[in-house]
Amino acid sequence: MRASVVIPCYRPDANFEKMLGDLNAQTCQDFDVVLADDGNTPPLAARIEATLNRPHRVIRFDQNRGIVAGLNACIAAVSAPVVIRMDADDRMPPDRIARQLTFLDNHPDVDVVGASMAVFGSGLRMWTKPASHHDICASLLWAPSLNHPTVAARTKVLQGHPYEEGHHLAEDYALWLTLAQEGVTFANNPFCAVYYRMEGQNTSQNGPQAKLKRYVSMHQFAIQTLLPHADAAELTPGLTNGAHQVLAGMCALRDPNSPGLEKVKHHSEALLCALEAHGERHPEDAWIQAAQHATRTRLARVEANTRWHKLEGVLNPVSYTHLTLPTKA
């Protein structure tokens, strides 16, 4: 087998069978499937056997252990050279696996590749991320630069770097930061690999206070990981103080006349000042250069009354190819 599709499953709804049908319909058939039945009652074996006609393995947990445990168990069981991520209630086009395997074949230097995804529920939006390794690494200061459900990766990379507990609902972001620090090479292939379902996502875990807490925590973790020489006391207070403003401004970015844009701008300007001060003391730190460029780019987008999330794929990230960032040994 050329690849294994790994799928953590917890309380999948009626769309589960549709997702399995998408696996059956793939134009590339040289793959198997590893599913984690994460304490579901009744077990999922009957539903899987009735629908999935691909070689597969089900790892059964007697009780719910969470997505990190499910992903790690699935990945540990993979023997194929490539791991492909999928969620239990999402959909994918029939050429997804073929296109991602072809990309990895044609780019042997790339370890992890993501793609765009169409997000649907109350509407339809396209989430597109930066394409090049340098752009992805620079953008990691602000947010995850790969759409997690779209990722395909070399098995040896993921088996050597399991997902970590302790980053609730941000386990992918933490992993990308760790891999970036170690010189793993990223890419995004900008085709739509997944139709991502947002329905049923509005739990208490996604409320404003929970989002704020995760935002501050992961933003600080990003700085500590990507900028190991940074003075945490210097950089993180601005992040903490500005987090409420940034959170309030996220939705406001849809409206170019919203005062939320000004709040995001002020926070970005404060962070940029701190980054520039750090860069003057550590001119050898390539990550700080990337962070400064990413922050200036974000400011330019805000000042142009554009959204920073790159929805609809209309925003082109600035190039960072002139920077010297960590590479694999």
Locate predicted features:
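Acidic donor-binding/catalytic loop of UDP-sugar-dependent glycosyltransferases
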Residues: 43, 90-102
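Short, acidic, metal-binding catalytic loop of nucleotide-sugar glycosyltransferases
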Residues: 21-30
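A conserved acidic beta->alpha catalytic loop
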Residues: 37-46, 63, 87
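Short aromatic/hydrophobic "clamp" motif used to bind/position activated sugar donors
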Residues: 83
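Glycine-rich, basic loop-to-helix element that forms the pyrophosphate-binding segment
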Residues: 61-78
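Conserved donor NDP-sugar-binding/catalytic core segment of glycosyltransferases
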Residues: 97-126
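Conserved small/polar residues in nucleotide/adenosyl-binding loops
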Residues: 320-327
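Conserved nucleotide-sugar donor-binding catalytic segment
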Residues: 134-218, 229-238
